[in-house]
Amino acid sequence: FFSMIPKIATGIASLVKNL
C-alpha cells in the first residue's frame, strides 16, 4: 500500500502542474 503513495502523489502533482 505504502509503495503506491509516491505514485499517487506524483500523479496529483502532475495534475496540479497542468492546471
From Swiss-Prot:
Name of the protein in question = Phylloseptin-3.1TR
The entry assigns this protein to a family as follows: Belongs to the frog skin active peptide (FSAP) family. Phylloseptin subfamily.
Query: Where does it primarily localize?
Result: secreted
* Function in brief: The amidated Phylloseptin-3.1TR has weak antimicrobial activity against Gram-negative bacterium E.coli ATCC 25922 (MIC=100 uM), Gram-positive bacterium S.epidermidis ATCC 12228 (MIC=12.5 uM) and against fungus C.albicans ATCC 24433 (MIC=25 uM). Has an anti-inflammatory effect, since it inhibits the production of the pro-inflammatory cytokines TNF-alpha, and induces the production of the anti-inflammatory cytokine IL-10. Has an activity of stimulation of insulin release, which may protect the species from being eaten by predators by causing fatal hypoglycemia. The non-amidated Phylloseptin-3.3TR has weak antimicrobial activity against fungus C.albicans ATCC 24433 (MIC=100 uM). Not active against Gram-negative bacterium E.coli ATCC 25922 and Gram-positive bacterium S.epidermidis ATCC 12228 at concentrations up to 100 uM. Has an anti-inflammatory effect, since it inhibits the production of the pro-inflammatory cytokines TNF-alpha and IL-1 beta, and induces the production of the anti-inflammatory cytokine IL-10.
The free-text tissue note of the record is: Expressed by the skin glands.
Per UniProt, which keywords does this protein have? Amidation, Amphibian defense peptide, Antibiotic, Antimicrobial, Cytolysis, Fungicide, Hemolysis, Immunity, Innate immunity, Pharmaceutical, Secreted
What GO terms in the biological process aspect are recorded for it?
Answer: defense response to bacterium; defense response to fungus; innate immune response; killing of cells of another organism
Q: Where in the cell is it found?
A: Secreted
The answer to whether UniProt assigns keyword NADP to this entry is: no
Q: Which GO terms describe its cellular component?
A: extracellular region
Residues recorded with modification Leucine amide: L19
Disulfide bridges in this chain: none
Asked if the keyword Nucleotidyltransferase belongs to this entry, the reply reads no
Q: Which domain of life is it from?
A: Eukaryota
Q: How is it modified after translation?
A: Phylloseptin-3.1TR is amidated, whereas Phylloseptin-3.3TR is the name given to the non-amidated form.
